[in-house]
Amino acid sequence: ESIKLSYDTGKKALEKMLQYMETVSQGEAENIRKTIQDLFRQTCILQVKCDPATLVQHDNPRYQVCLRHREFIADYLSVLDCELVHDPQEHIFRITGDGVMTERMSLMTTKLVILLKMIYRDKIMGEGLHATTTNLAEIREYGKNTNLITRRLTGQEWNDALVLMKTHQMIELPGAVANLEDFTPIYIYSTVNVFCSAMDINELVREYQNEMTE
């Protein structure tokens, strides 16, 4: 009986969603499809994006799609065991739940995310909200000072970490990772705090320092 009930509920939800898609224009339906695709790929969508070179901020059209069709997208995601969460403080939409693909970070990528969290915190405390940019030279310096990075990283290690952070909307790069130089600006979004957020930064640093000495 419960299986039949579940099937009927799912069928009704699907019919409702198909009806909804028929009420929007073809272009808007495509926007909804791409936005859902981005949510799964990135896990979050920012309200505002930033150009790291000019610090010019611009509205993200995908965020506006989430706002306009929030109920529909939430219903669609719920069928896939996911939940659409709006975080007004961080100005993001993100997805959580069993249906979300979790990406395992390598130890080095995790360390680099922690370093970015530290740099972001220090910039916010010291220079205000408009100066959350960093660069490879500064990340290396923080790595050396915290003892989280004790050797020269390979190009592949940098690439893996930066691509993952860009994909998940933690940073913005002015171009391809391969073209980054030591002082090319990298913009850090506040979403860097959404990741590894369960512990205090200092606690995280201690944990990963211990991992290196064992």
Segments from the language model and where they lie:
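Short, amphipathic alpha-helical interaction segments positioned at domain boundaries
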Residues: 187-214
